[in-house]
Amino acid sequence: MALKQQRKQEIIGEYQTHETDTGSADVQVAMLTEKITKLSAHLRNNKQDYSSQRGLLKMIGKRKRLLTYIQKQNQERYKALITRLGIRG
């Protein structure tokens, strides 16, 4: 489930840490969260799409690793990011 270029630019603009930032951990987590949301909606309608289900689990794992990295680097930034993204109760 690829994101449209316009939506990618919106996410980058919202989560970038400086003007030329396109690949920081914050931006990557935001992109993965968007992809996970779209893929979850797809899987609700297509329950037997096992290859997409595996891709979803891989994305969730990657997002978890990136969030762990952010948490180790800066606890305040981590808390602000998960609040903005609306993940983890």
Curated annotation (Swiss-Prot):
One of its GO terms (cellular component) is cytosolic small ribosomal subunit. Coiled coil: none annotated. The keyword Ribonucleoprotein applies. One of its GO terms (biological process) is translation. One of its GO terms (molecular function) is structural constituent of ribosome. InterPro entries: Ribosomal_uS15 (IPR000589), Ribosomal_uS15_bac-type (IPR005290), uS15_NS1_RNA-bd_sf (IPR009068). Keywords: Ribonucleoprotein, Ribosomal protein, RNA-binding, rRNA-binding. Signal peptide: none annotated. It comes from the Bacteria. One of the primary rRNA binding proteins, it binds directly to 16S rRNA where it helps nucleate assembly of the platform of the 30S subunit by binding and bridging several RNA helices of the 16S rRNA. Forms an intersubunit bridge (bridge B4) with the 23S rRNA of the 50S subunit in the ribosome. Belongs to the universal ribosomal protein uS15 family. NCBIfam families: S15_bact. This is Small ribosomal subunit protein uS15. The lineage of its organism: Bacteria, Bacillati, Cyanobacteriota, Cyanophyceae, Oscillatoriophycideae.
